[in-house]
């Protein structure tokens, strides 16, 4: 069975095929307790374990649990036992919360919010032969039918992610003389790429990665901070679910950086892939085309949600195109009408340049897929990377081809992907600078574009994963 996680998470060395019980990938130091002697373990018929001490006393042993917090994105669980990691990130967990709400008193219920990505919407539209707008409205109807209170479009949170990426690039470009690691700036929306960078290249590569949060995590801030205030609720009273094209988003949501210590809650409580939503529809016995449409919800009064929106620049969010246009205008006073992509070795590695009188002013690139990411990093290490900005995505062909997207058994994958791309492109594109409600939230929620609040809620940080040297790595 193919792993649903990205290639960047799966591929490390050649000796990567291991069973989950063969090696411990995250050793835990166990303190030896004084006076402890030899004990026996008894296994009962029901599968429970009991420790039998020398004095005849017994103690029931608790089962060890592995959650996403334990994940190092290393060569063990992700390769051979990823199902162990996602017990708290599945449609079954959503069903448990909805069932608990039905049984609880009104004061004890949690407000359930679902945020749907444009990529997942396009994949579902292809499967059900609907247009993206009808898919969005019928999906809203379905979620509300099973007990969800609000359904949002993550294209709205992507406005903020794009705007912050634009501003960060301009700041770094202007300050590159003072900071050797200012450029190139590498996009940060792909969690598979981030996990790979933290684990494999650490302190060398991390200063180059944009600190702007991904659309999923910006939506987490919007829902658990702004929207919670509007609803007069604490963040822990909201259960926030996102629908994403990628299994790696489950790992992103589980990062400690996105955990609210004060209220003991995550910005995103549960991530469902497109495929998991499809299974949820099947389990509920619902045919999406048969549902009556319902309008999407708006996060604030200034934001219209009559129909879903998207952005120019491709199915991975359009980071290269939006940063390129903004930088050309802001730094050089040049308005770019059309962005021209130049394919290099393959379609997943393309370049864009801004030239004036024969001089290259801006040199951008997009690198999709693990092979191209490795080539990019090697060029950086050799000091031969000519780019100012790179849109990096772990999946070949980008997010529309994510591991969590729906597959068609009776249709070639390339043909299906092209169909999903066409459907994705049918949605009205909106410039983040002109999006209704965005500037209102910058003013009233974030207290300005460069405020401490904006930095805290729209940006993040990265952590190099130290490689533990243990006897488990020895081969005899």
UniProtKB/Swiss-Prot annotation:
Keywords: 4Fe-4S, Acetylation, Iron, Iron-sulfur, Metal-binding. GO terms for biological process: hematopoietic progenitor cell differentiation; intracellular oxygen homeostasis; iron-sulfur cluster assembly; regulation of gene expression; response to hypoxia. This is Cytosolic iron-sulfur assembly component 3. One of its GO terms (molecular function) is metal ion binding. The modification N-acetylalanine is found at residue 2. The gene is CIAO3. It holds the Pfam family Fe_hyd_lg_C. It comes from the Eukaryota. Belongs to the NARF family.
């Amino acid at each position: 069975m193919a792993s649903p996680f990205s290639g960047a998470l799966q591929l490390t060395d050649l000796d990567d095929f291991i069973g989950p019980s063969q090696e411990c990938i995250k050793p835990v130091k166990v303190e030896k307790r004084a006076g402890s002697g030899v004990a026996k373990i008894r296994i009962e018929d029901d599968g429970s374990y009991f420790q039998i001490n020398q004095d005849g006393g017994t103690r029931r042993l608790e089962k060890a649990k592995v959650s996403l917090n334990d994940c190092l994105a290393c060569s063990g669980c992700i390769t051979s036992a990823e199902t162990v990691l996602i017990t708290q990130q599945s449609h079954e967990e959503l069903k448990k919360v909805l069932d608990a709400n039905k049984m609880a008193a009104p004061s004890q219920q949690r407000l359930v919010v679902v945020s749907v990505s444009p990529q997942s919407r396009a994949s579902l539209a292809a499967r059900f032969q609907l247009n993206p707008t009808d898919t969005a409205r019928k999906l809203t109807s379905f979620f509300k039918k099973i007990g969800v209170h609000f359904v949002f479009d993550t294209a709205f949170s992507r406005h903020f992610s794009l705007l912050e990426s634009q501003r960060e690039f301009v700041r770094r470009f202007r300050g590159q003389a003072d900071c050797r690691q200012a450029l190139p700036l590498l996009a940060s929306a792909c969690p598979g790429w981030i996990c790979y960078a933290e684990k494999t290249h650490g302190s060398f590569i991390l200063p180059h990665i944009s600190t702007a949060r991904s659309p999923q995590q910006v939506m987490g801030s919007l829902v658990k901070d702004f929207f919670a205030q509007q609803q007069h609720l604490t963040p822990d009273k909201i259960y926030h679910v996102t629908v994403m094209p990628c299994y790696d988003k489950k790992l992103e949501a589980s990062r400690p950086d996105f955990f609210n210590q004060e209220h003991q809650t995550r910005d995103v409580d549960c991530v469902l892939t497109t495929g998991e939503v499809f299974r949820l529809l099947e389990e509920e016995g619902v045919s999406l085309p048969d549902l009556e449409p319902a309008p999407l919800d708006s996060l604030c009064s200034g934001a219209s949600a009559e129909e879903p929106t998207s952005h120019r620049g491709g199915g991975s969010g359009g980071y290269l195109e939006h940063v390129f246009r903004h930088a050309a205008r802001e730094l050089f006073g040049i308005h770019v009408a059309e962005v021209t992509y130049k394919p290099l070795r393959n379609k997943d590695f393309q370049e864009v340049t801004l030239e004036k009188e024969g001089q290259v002013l801006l040199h951008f690139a997009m690198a999709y897929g693990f092979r191209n990411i490795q080539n990019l990093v090697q060029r950086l290490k050799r000091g031969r990377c000519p780019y100012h900005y790179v849109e990096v995505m772990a999946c070949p062909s980008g997010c529309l081809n994510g591991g969590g997207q729906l597959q068609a058994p009776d249709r070639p994958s390339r043909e299906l992907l092209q169909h999903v791309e066409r459907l994705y492109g049918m949605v009205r594109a909106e410039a983040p600078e002109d999006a209704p409600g965005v500037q209102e939230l910058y003013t009233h929620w974030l207290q300005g574009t460069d405020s401490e609040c904006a930095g805290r809620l729209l940006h993040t940080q990265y952590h190099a994963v130290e490689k533990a040297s243990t006897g488990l790595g020895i081969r005899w």
